[in-house]
């Protein structure tokens, strides 16, 4: 998936969580957008990889793309880091939900992810798509609509 789809996936997931669980919607959406980019630190040409080129190059060299940073092990480590060092639960939850949305979206691609890293088994959802394809554009549109819906519901109440 492309960076914009990951960002919208993080925002959509976090606005839904804010709606259903009472989190702050603005903090959740912002941290979800950031969290949705974090797993791609392993890709030097990703949005986050270009912002942190040295870290990205190191992670990419050591692990490769869609391996460690796209795994449950990485999520567990990030959970301990965020819950220990980020006191605001809106932000820590948003980061984690954003990262989880990233893994789900990348598992929806042709190559899938190594969710059980260090195992070499790739996990891919049964219906999958090519990154940057028309199918991804439809997913992006759906995530955008979901985000708009939840933002509306959060700030204006019932829709119908």
Curated annotation (Swiss-Prot):
Residues 1-29 form the signal peptide. It is found in: Cell membrane. The keyword Ribonucleoprotein does not apply. This is Uncharacterized protein YvsG. It is a multi-pass membrane protein. GO terms for cellular component: plasma membrane. It comes from the Bacteria. Its main location: membrane. Keywords: Cell membrane, Membrane, Signal, Transmembrane, Transmembrane helix. Pfam families: YdjM. InterPro entries: YdjM-like. The chain crosses the membrane at residues 67-87, 137-157. The keyword Cell inner membrane does not apply. To E.coli YdjM. It comes from Bacillus subtilis (strain 168).
